[in-house]
Amino acid sequence: MPKLSVIVPFYNVRQFAPDTVRSLRANARPDFEFVLVDDHSDDGTAAVLERAAEDLSGVARVRHVRHDRNRGIAAARNTGLGAAQGEFLAFLDGDDWLAPGYLSELVAAAERLDCDFVRTDHVRVTDRARTVRRVPVGLRDEVLDPRDAILPADRTTSVDYVSVWAGAYRRRLLERGLLHFTEGLHTAEDRPWTWRLHREAESFAVVNPLGVFYRRGISSSLTRIGDVRRLDFIRAFDQIVEETAADRDAGRLLPKAVRQYCAIMAHHLAEEDRFEPAVAGRLRTMSAAALRRLPQDLLTEVLETMDMDRAARLRRLRRRAGAGKGAA
């Protein structure tokens, strides 16, 4: 069994894939496995990966899989999980890269602490600017209960750090069904995944290796595109709320889920001019319907704890939604 499997989905990233592959080579070990998943690229990425699979096979174990149609990053990661054989599992996106030696440091930390998963800080790269983004957990190199790291509801916590590629996960989590992503979500697929992991895993730790470089602001990224796919955050958070409401600690955890949902919704509404006009209209309609679906007493409490601008924006939408429902 390989010590570590790194699952790397690629889709139309020919410009960046060579950097990603070079960084994998700089982290290779004979007991590491690289799972390269091509999500039906049509820009030349496939040829890059064919060469990469041959090159990397001399320094590590390699599995190269190609989808027969584009299925999205959630499905590509799931395909990688199905192929991966490692004791530990990690993720990397096809347009990001790793510092040399990072993976060995990550595995050493995970083995030393012997917990279900470990998380790391990462470097956000925007053009030439680089910023370290830290896991919002105060204790380092100490095994913690991931449930406790969900709270408090009114602070930035570990479930707000949705960088699935900044960490490593023991195979037992995969065997328990905790590492698969919800397919069909075009964005925010990492949010239900992160919540489920924190609710269901038994232990985790934040460790010090810093070596993931995340490209931000790529023109093809969904964060830069104003089409209907970005509205999938609503389906993602509906899933979070539904699953958390069924949890044994729902009374304790649900306020955080609702607050996070409201915060992300308010963020998108504040930037609705970046959406295509028809999509902006759907954003308002779908957000209003989502507010109606939330537990109303809890929603009222959450809005009272949010800052004035975001709370006012959501209250206006909530009033319109209520008026529209009454008129109907």
Q: Can you name each region flagged by the protein language model?
A:
Residues 209-217, 223-251, 265-267, 273-294:
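Catalytic core of nucleotide-sugar-dependent glycosyltransferases
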Residues 31, 273-328:
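Membrane-interface aromatic/basic loop that binds lipid-linked glycans or pyrophosphate carriers
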Residues 1, 41, 54, 156, ...:
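Short, intrinsically disordered/low-complexity patches at protein termini
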Residues 258-268:
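P-loop NTPase catalytic cores that bind/hydrolyze ATP
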Residues 67, 73, 108, 115, ...:
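General helical secondary-structure elements
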Residues 1-232:
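Nucleotide-sugar donor-binding/catalytic module of glycosyltransferases
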Residues 249-260:
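Residues within HEAT/ARM-like alpha-solenoid scaffolds
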